[in-house]
């Protein structure tokens, strides 16, 4: 029997279903990830928290699609606004800030000098470096600034040696082995490779117990103001990555293999253990570490004489995460 009412109801069902679907969809949060670029300045293990955040899927989990790039101009690209975040040393970002730029460190990985001064076998003591060639990453880099900070402790200045821009750690190791340089500052665990090649550890900077802000997560004050939620989510990913470093060797080592471009399990494990032992669960940057950097820079940059170390750090977002109990909850 034909029933007009039934036909009308049937026609209305798809419309009703579509309306309900639209209401549900409109109520769902947007999962479109923020697309950003992030720089890291070296392939040393203390840069690895960023790598673990990527490989561990933590950035995308927090709504961030990041293109992570290795560049020797990490601070320049950050200051220019070409990237939103950078993994770099306190000395690298401090030089830019002292010259009027606005970078700030929002999380710290390393707060003491740990490099080894590695030399060819014929060099037996620090005094033997006089007149010799020492390789650094590039002028103004962490390896350069740390070297000129340490040399005066042993009666040497940068004028007593020839400093050569050689490149990152792999290039410095090759230059050492080939004899084109006589010594170089090498971050652990890569000094072990130098030892295996017959080089001598002339100085372990860790023995000096010098507070010095090494690698950390850096952004700009512009980003903290204009993209604060993005910065909050990025830092959350970073803190979660530290948790993975502490508790998940498998994912962490996968990240090290990818970004250090090696399949050598011994090298991967050495690098991973270095980061695991160095990074703190609550990565507050070191005010004392920045104080050392600024004092050292005062001879080269006039603005350093009146600079306040606290101005180089912004822990407001880290304190939010900490006080909320988020960090402690990761380790329960």
Task: Set out the residue ranges of the language-model regions.
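Short, glycine-/small- and polar/acidic-enriched structural segments
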Residues: 32-178, 182-188, 200-211
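Periplasmic-binding protein-like
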Residues: 40, 109-119, 197-227, 231, ...
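Conserved C-terminal helix/tail region of periplasmic/extracytoplasmic solute-binding proteins
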Residues: 295-332
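Short helix- or helix-capping micro-motifs
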Residues: 194
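Ligand-binding clefts/hinges and TM-proximal coupling segments of bilobed small-molecule sensing domains
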Residues: 142-157, 161, 237-270, 311-313, ...
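Bacterial N-terminal signal peptides
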Residues: 14-27
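N-terminal secretory signal peptides that target proteins for export/translocation
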Residues: 1-11
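Secondary-structure end/capping motifs
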Residues: 226-305
